Swiss-Prot record:
Peptide chain release factor 2 directs the termination of translation in response to the peptide chain termination codons UGA and UAA. GO terms for molecular function: translation release factor activity, codon specific. PROSITE patterns: RF_PROK_I. The keyword Cell inner membrane does not apply. Belongs to the prokaryotic/mitochondrial release factor family. This is Peptide chain release factor 2.
């Protein structure tokens, strides 16, 4: 093996050792043991919400441990591949060396991707995520675009086996959605998805235009951490107005014969939250209250950041606006305007393959915070 490659493998070993230390591999094993004990409790499923969270965290933690252990195994096998290549002769030697080099490059990329997880150290990064998507300028195309974005995030969650809980969907008259709110139940979902917050722009030939003209549409993505009891977001009963109405589906059609949908208005701030996806009024009220608490927590965080920016003389950040462009016509490209990361196959991105964008966004945010 060439000395340069030996040095590069040593650098990979150092990087992976850092990842193992930051992720606390022994701590992961202990956490898995505890979660497996909880999951084996026959009474766990008496509380569906808790059961879902326990099984989701168990699956995520097991996957995280497997990923790190597999990286360590591959790194230990890598020098062996180069030794075997050195023993070959002629064309076989070239093929074996190419195979070893390919594994080296793949392993380096996988370790770099795992390093991203160690950058999620913000106060709320470990939380589950509450995502709201709203259609913007662009009429029916914008409503359709908002629904496409929702599908993209749901598909991403499904590919990672993260449960998704839809709280509310407000359908547009002709097609698509006006807005939707859903939770992604997975550890670090907030820290990961928070880089998606901002305006997403779509350029395509409109399927709703009988002249097949090009249309630019916008949708806004908001990502909040799910509130926990330790956040102490107490809402006096008199501060909330509760309105009930019938759930509606696409085109405004009623999907329920009772007034099960709930609208909460926080009187002091004017924040309005709706929930209509649960079967009962009580369930919708509980879900809507969770969303309202998350929005009030975010409002508190924004106020605290504004005070800090004022002390620092910082004008604040507007990076969330126009954060990504999805062009389907006249060429095909998805490009993040903050990180410059881009992919030439929008179809795969819209089908949930967004890990590259998430990793680039997390690294960008980390560099920005260090400045």
């Amino acid at each position: 093996m060439e000395p340069d490659r030996q040095a590069e493998i040593a650098a990979l070993d150092s990087a992976l050792t850092t990842v193992e230390r930051v992720l606390d591999v022994e701590g992961l094993r202990s956490r898995i043991e505890k979660l497996e004990h909880e999951a084996s409790d026959p009474k766990l499923w008496d509380d569906q919400t808790r059961a879902q969270r326990v099984t989701s965290e168990l699956s995520h933690t097991q996957g995280e441990l497997r990923r790190v252990e597999e990286l360590r195994r591959r790194l230990e096998d890598l020098p062996v591949l180069y030794e075997l290549a050195a023993e070959e002769e002629g064309a076989a030697a070239g093929e074996a060396l190419a195979e070893a080099d390919a594994e080296f490059k793949a392993l380096r990329a996988d370790i770099e991707a795992t390093e991203v997880r160690t950058l999620l150290s913000g106060e709320y990064d470990e939380r589950e995520a509450l995502v709201t998507i709203r259609s913007g300028a662009g009429g029916v195309d914008a409503a359709d675009w908002a629904e496409m974005l929702m599908r993209m995030y749901v598909r991403w969650a499904e590919q990672h086996k993260y449960p998704v809980e839809v709280f509310d969907t407000s359908y547009a008259e002709e097609a698509g959605i006006k807005s939707a709110t859903f939770a992604v139940h997975a550890p670090f979902a907030y820290g990961t998805l928070s880089v998606e917050q901002g305006t997403h722009r779509l350029v395509r030939i409109s399927p709703f235009d009988n002249q097949s003209r090009r249309q630019t549409s916008f949708a806004e993505v908001e990502v909040l951490p799910v509130v926990e009891t330790t956040d102490h977001i107490d809402i006096p009963e008199g501060d909330v107005r509760v309105d009930v109405y019938r759930s509606s589906g696409p085109g405004g059609q009623s999907v329920n014969t009772t007034d099960s949908a709930v609208r909460l208005t926080h009187i002091p701030t004017g924040i309005v939250v709706t929930c209509q996806n649960e079967k009962s009024q009580l369930q919708n009220k509980v879900a809507a209250m969770r969303v309202l608490q998350a929005k009030l927590l975010e409002r508190k965080r924004i106020e605290e950041r504004a005070e800090l920016d004022a002390l620092k003389g910082d004008g604040g950040s507007s990076w969330g606006n126009q954060m990504r462009s999805y062009v389907l016509h006249p060429y095909q490209m998805v490009k993040d305007l903050r990180t410059e990361y881009e992919v030439g196959n929008p179809a795969t991105v819209l089908d949930g393959d967004i890990d590259g964008f998430l990793e680039a966004g997390i690294r960008w945010r980390n560099r920005k915070d260090d400045d």
